[in-house]
Amino acid sequence: MKRTVGFCILILSVFLIFSCATNNALMKDVYAGYFSIAEEYFKMEKFAKAAEFYEKCLSDNDELTLRNVKYKLAQTYLKLSKWSDASKIYEELLQIDFENTNLKTLLAYSYMKQELFDEAEKIYLSMIESQSLNQSSYKNLILLYGIKNDFEKAETELASYKEKFPLDETIITIETEISNLKKKFEEEQKKAQEEVEKSEDNSEENSESTKNNE
């Protein structure tokens, strides 16, 4: 795979030096070369290098090609945990392809990673409204509520989902996840309360000790 990338770079360099094509045609081939290199790096899971070469393709003025480049670049940003950069691209792509369910799902996911829960919730609710049989949107919404510790909504949506899709056995996984999140949250709350009480007890002891010393 490394040899493939090296070969692509070599061919691209030679092409840049010796090509006699027109400028537009030349740049088309240059961008195609960059894209091929980016794809190879992506396959090798060298996502930082893949992003570098996808970014070089962003000056391509072909609309369809540019859309594909942006989509692959956003995927790479997700791999690099660059949630904000990914969401910006998905927002751009949705302005053109505003009914694309996959783009909406990926945008909502990137919002969740940024803890922009309200924005993600709006997307999931909109998808559920327009596609009432979209099970993934329901389950993602339930998980969203669990992650933001809104367990009342999570459990309400979970019960509603089980009524709508009683034969979906995969919901057990979501149910377990919500249960684990709730348990973790309650344990953290209990620990925090114990710390507060301990701090208050220490404060009272110190205050009493000061009075006695006086």
Regions found by a protein language model. Give the residues of each.
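Register position in tetratricopeptide repeats
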Residues: 43-44, 79, 113, 147, ...
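Canonical tetratricopeptide repeat
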Residues: 72, 106, 140, 174-177
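Short coil turns that delineate tetratricopeptide repeat
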Residues: 62-64, 98, 132, 166
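TPR alpha-solenoid repeat register
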Residues: 67-69, 103, 137, 171
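Terminal, low-structured helical/coil segments at or just beyond the last alpha-helical repeat
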Residues: 155-214
